[in-house]
Amino acid sequence: MTVTIVGSQLGDEGKGGIVDLYGDDVDVVARYQGGDNAGHTVVHEGEEYKLSLVPSGAIRGKVGVLGNGCVVNPRTLFDEIDTLQERGLDPDVRIAERAHVILPFHRVLDGIEEELKSETDDEVGTTGRGIGPTYEDKAGRRGVRVGDLLDPDVLRERLEYVVPQKRAVVEDVYDLDVDELDDPDAFDVDAIFEEFREFGRRFEAEDMTVNAGAFLSATIDEGQNVMLEGAQGTIIDIDHGNYPYVTSSNPTAGGAATGTGLSPGVVGDGEVIGIVKAYLTRVGSGPLPTELGGVVGDTPGYDEQGEGENEELANYIREEGGEYGTVTGRPRRVGWLDLPMLRHSTRVSGFTGIAINHLDVLAGLDEVKVGHTYTLDGEELASMPATTEQWAKCEANFRSFDGWPEVDWADAAEEGYDALPENAKAYVEYIESELDTPAYAIGVGPGRGETIVREQPF
């Protein structure tokens, strides 16, 4: 069977920890979209592992698959694999031959485009890792796929077609001299060919490439369990998110089918677990109706740190929750939980269960609020509007909950749900009721043993 893990908010919900939590019953963990822009942290046997491309389950000795919906930077991939091996692990990672490859010029173009957007306050908040430009080339039918790295003739043909186009973009559209860039070799066919053909040789030598759909289907047919791991979150989905402040792929459950080669029926017959942070965070620009305080350069109209409402509360949550980007180190914007957002995410992906993380971060507050509904042009909305411009005009209608005290969270995790403070349980049960979806797990700390497990999906 399959279990699909979907971020229900704006990313950084703690998906990797839930993948790890249920990992003992899994044979294969497959990522179905994104690239090395999606950082996740896994704590295993007291050791912390920060990954951006290797699937979380590989830390526990499971087979990790990067599906065809992913974009793969072989530099990052092999750096992570080599680092894990140096720490005594031996990750088994397979790469879909249909997955597209992030090439050096993608990263350069990503940086140029974001810098130009920043001059007009239209920046999306990209990590600069070439994800968007790679997906653009995929849609434009000029990309290079992992399977191409295995065939030198095909690889050279692809590069000789696309690289001159990219040089022309830099020189004729952006009016820059390629030779004066920090990495002029990023636009050199021979340099790219030599480096990426070597990556192809390593893929072959280590038998890493697969036909992902066929591989995963055979795994399921053998009675094994497959976990499908999404990156980022629903609200930055290219179709269902707050466009244009989105990623370039589909983190929602629908992307699990297209990004692995499994049928929608197979994915739909399994469990779909939405991962919910007990409050809200965001990296980058765009609306955030329940925001507390702000971050200069990200929060619209926010020009001086410390000027926003509830700044002290925002800093408290940010520090208690360690709310800084895994990949970029950028401070995350923080806000109260947003129920219209979660209702939207639940509908889009059809969650059969949710996992609520970071409940402990809110402990010690006198009052905890939730954005229960929005008001837009005098009308109350229970779910997000379709356009970002409408969302930016929404005002949150809050519901208040009495806070809960700090407790020994490790003991609470061991004893189970009934050991939670009563007010914390009221908060959890409100979320379950509003989404009509049970909480399968409740995270009360960063470690695997600091999660209350109420339901095993496998």
Curated annotation (Swiss-Prot):
Binding site for Mg(2+): 12, 39
Binding site for IMP: 12-15, 37-40, 127, 141, 232, 247, 330
Subcellular location: Cytoplasm
Name of a matching Pfam family: Adenylsucc_synt
Active site residues per record: 12, 40
Main location: cytoplasm
Binding-site list for substrate: 326-332
UniProt-listed Enzyme Commission number(s): 6.3.4.4
Binding site for GTP: 11-17, 39-41, 332, 358-360, 443-445
Entry note: cofactor: Binds 1 Mg(2+) ion per subunit.
Gene Ontology molecular function: any one: GTP binding
GO CC annotation, single: cytoplasm
Residues passing through the membrane, by range: none
Pathway: Purine metabolism; AMP biosynthesis via de novo pathway; AMP from IMP: step 1/2
Cofactor(s) of this protein: Mg(2+)
Record keywords: Cytoplasm, GTP-binding, Ligase, Magnesium, Metal-binding, Nucleotide-binding, Purine biosynthesis
Protein task: Plays an important role in the de novo pathway of purine nucleotide biosynthesis. Catalyzes the first committed step in the biosynthesis of AMP from IMP.
Assembly mode: Homodimer.
Family as reported in the entry's similarity comment: Belongs to the adenylosuccinate synthetase family.
Identification of the protein by name: Adenylosuccinate synthetase
Name of the encoding gene: purA
